[in-house]
């Protein structure tokens, strides 16, 4: 359920821009180009957002910290006996 609200709301926003944006372009010699630019902008922005959003849901590689670094951090933060002995 937590993924559904941002997915639908952001997708709806870019769909409104992509479908509604070309209708507000005034008539002129470059109307077709401007309409295409609006549609392509909406598609590219949505694709960039959806790729970043979906890749954050299930990352392939998690953060990796050296054991030496973990011990140094635990010593500096004052939790050394609990972390090092486990």
From Swiss-Prot:
MF terms in GO: proton-transporting ATPase activity, rotational mechanism
Gene Ontology biological process: embryo development ending in birth or egg hatching; embryonic body morphogenesis; regulation of syncytium formation by plasma membrane fusion; transmembrane transport
Chief subcellular location: membrane
GO CC field: apical junction complex; apical plasma membrane; plasma membrane proton-transporting V-type ATPase complex; proton-transporting V-type ATPase, V0 domain
Ranges of the Cytoplasmic topological domain: 22-32
Lumenal side: 54-86
Residue ranges of the TM segments: 1-21, 33-53
Topology versus the membrane: Multi-pass membrane protein
Keywords recorded for this protein, A-Z: Cell membrane, Hydrogen ion transport, Ion transport, Membrane, Transmembrane, Transmembrane helix, Transport
InterPro entries, per the entry: ATPase_V0-cplx_e1/e2_su, ATPase_V0-cplx_e1/e2_su_met
Gene ablation phenotype (knockout): RNAi-mediated knockdown causes hyperfusion of epidermal cells in embryos.
Compartments reported by the entry: Apical cell membrane
Stated family: Belongs to the V-ATPase e1/e2 subunit family.
Function: Subunit of the V0 complex of vacuolar(H+)-ATPase (V-ATPase), a multisubunit enzyme composed of a peripheral complex (V1) that hydrolyzes ATP and a membrane integral complex (V0) that translocates protons. V-ATPase is responsible for acidifying and maintaining the pH of intracellular compartments and in some cell types, is targeted to the plasma membrane, where it is responsible for acidifying the extracellular environment. During embryonic development, the V-ATPase is required to repress fusion of epidermal cells probably by negatively regulating eff-1-mediated cell fusion.
PANTHER family in alphabetical order: V-TYPE PROTON ATPASE SUBUNIT, VACUOLAR ATP SYNTHASE SUBUNIT H
Subunit structure: V-ATPase is a heteromultimeric enzyme made up of two complexes: the ATP-hydrolytic V1 complex and the proton translocation V0 complex. The V1 complex consists of three catalytic AB heterodimers that form a heterohexamer, three peripheral stalks each consisting of EG heterodimers, one central rotor including subunits D and F, and the regulatory subunits C and H. The proton translocation complex V0 consists of the proton transport subunit a, a ring of proteolipid subunits c9c'', rotary subunit d, subunits e and f, and the accessory subunits vah-19/Ac45 and vah-20/PRR.
Name recorded for this polypeptide: V-type proton ATPase subunit e
Organism: Caenorhabditis elegans
């Amino acid at each position: 359920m937590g993924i559904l609200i941002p997915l639908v709301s952001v997708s709806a926003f870019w769909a409104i821009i992509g479908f509604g944006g070309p209708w507000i372009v005034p008539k002129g010699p470059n109307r077709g180009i401007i309409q295409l630019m609006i549609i392509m902008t909406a598609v590219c922005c949505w694709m960039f957002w959806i790729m970043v959003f979906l890749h954050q849901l299930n990352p392939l590689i998690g953060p990796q910290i050296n054991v030496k670094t973990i011990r140094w951090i635990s010593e500096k933060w004052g939790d050394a006996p609990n972390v090092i002995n486990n």
